[in-house]
C-alpha cells in the first residue's frame, strides 16, 4: 500500500515527467513517485519520490539523514555519502522557515539482476505540523538515476523542489 504524507503538499512535475502509482513501481512506502518518461526502457528510469513521517518532540537533521542512508544500505546494498550539506529552503515558497539537509549518495544496486551504479540526491526537511501541536514532520524528496543520467535530470529535480510547498486545504496533491 502506498505511503501517505502527514501534511498535504502541492507538487508539480517538470515537463517530461509523469506520476506513477508507488506500489506498481516498487516504492510502496512513497506517497508520490514521478518517472522521467524519455528514459523509460533504458535499463533504469530516473525517478523522484516523496515520503514523509512524523516525529514527536525534536529530531536531528543529521540523524534523519543517517537513518535514510542506513535504510538504503539495508534494502539496496553499498551506499557512499558523496556530500551532505545543511540548507535553508528559501527557493521553495512556503517552506522558507523549514530547516533542511541535502545529501548526495552513490549507490551500488542490483536492478533487474544487473549491477548498477546509481546516484541519489535527497532533500530532507523538517516542518511543524500545523494540525498537531508539537509534532514535527519529516519530508524526504529523492531523485534517483543512473550516474550517466544524472546531469540530464538534476535541473528537473531542482525545479520540482522549487515548486514544492504546503498544499492549500482546498487543493489536492
Identify what each model region corresponds to:
Residues 17, 137-173:
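Surface-exposed amphipathic alpha-helical segments
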Residues 56-59, 112, 148-152:
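A generic structural signal for short coil/turn motifs at secondary-structure boundaries
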Residues 11, 104-109, 141-143:
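Preference for bulky hydrophobic residues occupying beta-strand positions
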Residues 65-130, 158, 171:
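Signature of long, low-cysteine stretches enriched in small and polar/charged residues
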Residues 51-55, 71, 140-148:
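Short, solvent-exposed aromatic-acidic interface loops
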Residues 124-132, 140-141, 164:
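Compact, aliphatic and Gly/Pro-tolerant "microcore" segments centered on a short helix or tight beta-hairpin
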Amino acid at each position: 500500500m502506498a505511503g501517505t504524507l502527514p501534511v498535504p503538499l502541492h507538487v508539480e512535475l517538470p515537463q517530461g515527467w509523469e506520476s506513477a502509482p508507488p506500489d506498481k513501481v516498487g516504492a510502496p512506502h512513497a506517497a508520490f513517485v514521478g518517472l522521467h518518461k524519455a528514459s523509460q526502457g533504458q535499463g533504469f528510469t530516473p525517478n523522484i519520490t516523496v515520503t514523509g513521517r512524523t516525529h514527536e518532540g525534536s529530531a536531528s537533521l543529521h540523524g534523519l539523514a543517517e537513518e535514510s542512508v542506513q535504510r538504503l544500505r539495508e534494502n539496496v546494498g553499498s551506499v557512499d555519502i558523496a556530500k551532505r550539506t545543511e540548507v535553508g529552503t528559501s527557493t521553495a515558497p512556503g517552506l522558507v522557515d523549514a530547516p533542511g539537509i541535502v545529501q548526495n549518495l552513490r549507490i551500488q544496486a542490483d536492478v533487474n539482476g544487473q549491477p548498477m551504479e546509481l546516484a541519489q540526491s535527497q532533500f530532507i526537511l523538517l516542518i511543524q505540523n500545523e494540525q498537531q501541536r508539537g509534532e514535527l514532520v519529516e519530508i524526504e524528496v529523492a531523485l534517483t538515476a543512473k550516474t550517466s543520467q544524472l546531469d540530464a535530470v538534476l535541473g528537473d529535480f531542482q525545479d520540482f523542489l522549487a515548486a514544492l510547498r504546503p498544499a492549500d486545504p482546498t487543493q489536492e496533491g
